[in-house]
């Protein structure tokens, strides 16, 4: 369980924040030259630092963390790092979707209301609570289709360069949103937490790519607006291999503010501990199973990523993973008012985000740590017959079960 890595994670983060990071652009092509995330010490005036160094920040952070993101000319970097008001200077980097295996999705025509196999498998449709509109879910992603008839979009914001709104120009974020919260209104598809309020927080562009500074800006916005807008859950189906002290600190502060973060484990088929934010000890990290019929028993047809009721061949794994959920051939909403099927831990994660919202609708004062405990207590233990044949590690995370939640 993740509790086994909390102390190591906190120690690493504190050490990293306390010392400037070396320049590693030559070693990591995803680091963006001359772009930095600057964290300031408590009480430092951001404007004074910015003006003093002649910077023009792209983003200001003031709720989850205290600092800014800016282009810093090479000749000024050393002076900035040595400024007594600066806690850390971290290179900005490229962040991508937790690559969904079926890159563009398969278009689907939906008649009436379809019950996706994932929602069926976690028994979300059998829970007596049918409306979760009191809870807000932030989709930190490529945006959400703001006009989709099957989604209750309550607000949007964008931090992706060159965009003017949180509208989805990729499709991934809309798909994630529908899994979590598509309306149960007799039309389209049904989500795990029907009609939950969705907040589109666009931090990735049309290609599903963005910058770490954009993601931190998204987390900062969620933290700022959580109380006023009722945002109790945030889904992040994105990440990168490595660690970021700034992102770690931002998520930690947002969780402390009461937001439950649910994160995809990743699709590299390796240990999820290598990836951020999946390795953050305070988030709920989700792996994926292959399920083709929405039922336990292994009697459905085989998929491209494993037999029915097996651990998805692409899914990351390891002790940082908290729960498993369906993530293969998942039907959900898509951009431009359409529907599509996608595969990936990106699709598994919003099942759990929806379940968290489901529980919080009835118990709104529950802390993120308590939400995880409740989801795990009500989850289905792993058996080879019911979704876990092929899990490569010795730690067997349980399968999400919504029906048994209070």
Model-derived segments and spans:
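Gram-negative bacterial Sec-dependent N-terminal signal peptides
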Residues: 2-19
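Protease zymogen maturation seam
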Residues: 22-26, 51-65, 82-136, 144, ...
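C-terminal subdomain of the subtilisin-like protease fold in secreted/lumenal serine endopeptidases
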Residues: 28, 57-62, 190-196, 200, ...
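Short glycine-/aliphatic-rich beta-strand segments at the starts of folded cytosolic domains
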Residues: 32-39
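Active-site-proximal beta-strand/loop segments in catalytic clefts of secreted hydrolases
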Residues: 39-42, 72-73, 90-94, 139-143, ...
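Subtilisin-like serine protease catalytic core
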Residues: 125-156, 165-214, 227-233, 243, ...
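Extracellular S/T/G-rich loop segment that most often corresponds to the catalytic His/Ser-adjacent loop
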Residues: 135, 141-143, 259, 275-361, ...
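Gly/Ser-rich catalytic serine loop of serine hydrolases
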Residues: 163-177, 270, 340-352
